[in-house]
């Protein structure tokens, strides 16, 4: 029984927070790159023809740059995504509790505040449902479907699944 409690504690402390952080990162569309993301950011700024997914590779430290990137049009925060964001905000708020820090670590605190503010804004953003596209004008042309070959096959070979001739 002791080993089951240990596995449960490991899952609660390590697995679920990292999984939820991955869900939130996937919702941002921001893959976490430990290094080498700066060159791609420079290319994304200078080359408009590169796609968003391949060119804009940023980590959590460049969240302010996400406002310039066009978002997905069908993006909406559903219930489980909101739950994941709330849990990550709770974990990060506890982990990054204010403490007396030296001046050299002050920019890191600013990044933490930007991340928490961005997650809070994402959580409170009103989701727009996808817009229905309707045909604006209808055409009077109806395609003619020629069923004569099917009728001929049903008469010659006795196929019952084809169209029936009303003779």
From Swiss-Prot:
GO molecular function: translation regulator activity
Descriptive protein name: Secretion monitor
Segment forming the signal sequence: 1-29
Native organism taxonomy: Bacteria, Pseudomonadati, Pseudomonadota, Gammaproteobacteria, Enterobacterales
Family from the record: Belongs to the SecM family.
Keyword Coiled coil listed: no
Function: Regulates secA expression by translational coupling of the secM secA operon. Translational pausing at a specific Pro residue 5 residues before the end of the protein may allow disruption of a mRNA repressor helix that normally suppresses secA translation initiation.
Subcellular location: Cytoplasm, Cytosol; Periplasm
UniProt source species: Sodalis glossinidius (strain morsitans)
A GO-annotated cellular component: cytosol
The entry's keywords: Cytoplasm, Periplasm, Signal
UniProt-listed Pfam families: SecM
